[in-house]
């Protein structure tokens, strides 16, 4: 049997390579690297099935389906998104549903995918993420203790640095796409291993990345996920793992003593998912498909279908990119409108406060001045009243003396 490994050549996130690395150990060999965003146009060298472990985010572009007839899929740790991309929301799931039903049940990476497939009555279960199956690496222990920060905000990183004597190492999952594409997959997986060694030797890892936090659980490294307080999409992704991860919203994290965070120990509740994933994959990855006679001729399929589909995909990609540019422009304009609206409201509120403070100030000044004037008038009245009475008394005395 031939085996294919899912890869994403154009990724800008090493998390995709980490998922491919995690799947690699379950394959007896790698005969083909199967590009995640071109599953529909994959063609092997010969007329044969290629067993593929379908872990990762599929149909990101939402038009690359059905998958190639040569792919014999085992869906586990699978993510599908219903978020609107290029104007498409769930239409691709409706069209892709017969294929998914044929190869179900689908092992979903998260509750979002599980609920989406339930909506279209596609048999599925929550399998968890394949990165939980990563094995510890053989690497010397670090001579010094350190905290590793992975794609956290500047505020979080500075808070850690200012409140600990431990060394702080900063890492990112962001990649330079052009530079990464120049590397072979073996070189990319070596980069993954080197990054995982840093995580494995850390005293504590603090991250916003799910594909950093889950491998850290598998490696036995204490890890804390710092969540985005406002992102609905982010919360949808992590909700499936909150029971086995320690997590803080950023505001709460910045209030927590670092000494308390350094006492953190991981929960063991992830082990059930890890063990289940390993068993399911081992039980299914070598299951053969003896129906190869029904496959199309490779040369015919390549000439008639693939070349035509590639042209259609290029057209769709152009349309999608044009839509995305317009969408991004509109989104940026909306952000600007929201920004100025918020600033206007804040300025208006500040102005009202300033006017109120100003009013109160001048009202007090006026009242104080009025009171001072009234007191001056009264004092003046009292003075002249006394002067008058004294004068009157003197007049009376003079008048009486005259008589």
PLM features: residue spans?
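Residues forming the hydrophobic interface stripe of long heptad-repeat coiled-coil alpha-helices
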Residues: 344, 348-351, 355-362, 366-384, ...
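Short acidic DE-rich linear segments
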Residues: 402-403
């Amino acid at each position: 049997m031939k085996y294919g490994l899912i890869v994403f050549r154009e990724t800008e996130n090493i998390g995709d390579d980490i998922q491919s690395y995690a799947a690699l150990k379950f394959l007896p060999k790698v005969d083909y690297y199967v590009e995640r965003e071109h599953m529909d146009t994959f063609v092997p060298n010969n007329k044969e099935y290629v067993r593929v472990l379908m872990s990762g985010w599929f149909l990101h572009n939402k038009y690359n389906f059905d998958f190639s007839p040569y792919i014999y899929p085992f869906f586990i740790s699978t993510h599908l998104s219903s978020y609107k991309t290029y104007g498409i929301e769930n239409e691709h799931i409706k069209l892709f549903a017969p294929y998914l039903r044929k190869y179900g049940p689908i092992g979903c990476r998260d509750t979002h995918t599980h609920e989406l497939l339930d909506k279209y009555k596609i048999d599925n279960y929550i399998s968890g993420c394949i990165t939980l199956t990563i094995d510890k690496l053989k690497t010397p222990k670090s001579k010094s203790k350190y905290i590793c920060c992975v794609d956290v905000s500047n505020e979080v990183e500075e808070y850690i640095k200012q409140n600990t004597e431990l060394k702080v190492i900063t890492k990112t999952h962001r990649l330079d796409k052009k530079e990464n594409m120049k590397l072979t997959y073996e070189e990319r997986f070596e980069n993954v291993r080197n990054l995982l060694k840093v995580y494995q030797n850390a005293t504590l890892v603090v991250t916003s990345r799910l594909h950093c936090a889950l491998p850290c659980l598998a490696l036995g490294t204490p890890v804390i996920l710092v969540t985005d307080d406002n992102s609905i999409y982010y919360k949808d992704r992590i909700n499936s793992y909150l029971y086995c991860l320690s997590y803080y919203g950023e505001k709460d994290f910045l209030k927590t003593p670092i000494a308390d965070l350094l006492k953190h120990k991981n929960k063991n509740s992830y082990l059930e998912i890890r063990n289940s994933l390993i068993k399911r994959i081992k039980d299914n990855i070598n299951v053969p498909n003896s129906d190869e006679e029904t496959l199309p001729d490779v040369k015919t399929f390549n000439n008639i279908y693939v070349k035509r589909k590639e042209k259609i995909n290029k057209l769709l990609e152009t349309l999608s990119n044009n839509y995305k540019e317009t969408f991004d422009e509109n989104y940026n304009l909306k952000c600007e409108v929201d920004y100025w609206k918020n600033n206007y409201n804040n300025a208006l509120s500040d102005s009202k406060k300033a006017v109120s403070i100003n009013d109160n100030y001048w009202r007090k000044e006026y009242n104080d001045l009025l009171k001072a004037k009234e007191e001056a008038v009264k004092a003046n009245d009292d003075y002249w009243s006394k002067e008058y009475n004294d004068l009157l008394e003197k007049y009376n005395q003079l008048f009486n003396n005259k008589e």
